[in-house]
């Protein structure tokens, strides 16, 4: 590695996970970014560049491109700028081009190797930790074990079947001829079990943090690790591996597709598998984002006066759309102006204060699971005996109740109709993968919004690597997870970029009572 750098070759590394940092001299990046490595003399922290930014980054957060030392010198590449053309063969300059079949074989071998190591880690968690915990009823309740380990046993069983099929497709003599794409397609529905695990992971970390304040639990978990002859990583590091693993599949498949010729029998299967796994990680990331927003929903509900009935979080986890419309509940009823908040499963009706327009009063809700949306053409409605423009109805399929709504503009009506379709789609997808908010997450949201204090910046000069230990990949034999002072949830993020905060939350800040 150092020889390549000192030999004036451009050495590129791909980010396996996001590196979110609050230190000025560290280099921040997202999973999938390509980093130009400038200094690898320190085994833990490397110095690299993306675009015009330079800084230190943990070596364990990146992976050197396979076959890098064997590729051809070409013209200036986007690799130098931290971006890579997926159709480009240039990952490093200054070496002769290696046979594409050998490149594909290297990627296949890497995939198989990581899968075998991953299975061992899952086995260690289930047999080394969970099995031993179940024997100690005096220390762990069933509820605690469910929070800490989630559905790790389901993941272990699924992965064993998946790896078994991978091994059948692996060509030991000629790895480049292996056809592993179909394995991902055959097991695509099974990968959704990772959603439950990832959503529960924050609860697991909090529960472990509470237990680790007691030295008995520290000694117990360490004894479990030694008894199972596991590598020197704390239990929270092992429990992080499934979160990391599901994020890594799109990166591996993208690299495999890059070195798979279009006339290869596995090409179309790998391309399809890449699309499937990108969708899986994107949806898991989306649900993680929603869980991060539930405290905002709880805060908003607390700001609404005269609230009645169940909490929003008892059924919903996402604000989809909001706006002000005219509303008639029953035939010959009075036209009323209301502010509507559409969540998954329900729509909340609020009234603005006559004097303080930023104060909201609760006026009811509509169960979206029982209603269907009916688009209405402009004209006169015989049922309500009113002239309609930019109108639509919500019709209760059981009781025949009807709500009539009037948007101010046609564009606003179209946005509402689109939002209702999105709400139904979200509900169906959540039901498919069993997405729900845990009782512990609801309690946490009801109590407070967890805030991470910002650290003061430091000199951005190159100087020396950070003094604290770097975060390490538990799939390798590292010892640490996160630098001191940096929350674990900030370091390990999902593959897909986070969506920006919904503009609706900006509206909420204007609709809170008694603003100072």
UniProtKB/Swiss-Prot annotation:
One GO term (biological process): regulation of small GTPase mediated signal transduction
Domain spans labelled PH: 318-425
Modified positions (Phosphoserine) in chain numbering: 502
Molecular function (Gene Ontology), one example: guanyl-nucleotide exchange factor activity
Subcellular location: Cytoplasm; Postsynaptic density
Subunit structure, interactors included: Interacts with GPHN.
Function: Acts as a guanine nucleotide exchange factor (GEF) for CDC42. Promotes formation of GPHN clusters.
Protein name (Swiss-Prot/TrEMBL): Rho guanine nucleotide exchange factor 9
Source organism per UniProt: Homo sapiens
Gene this protein is translated from: ARHGEF9
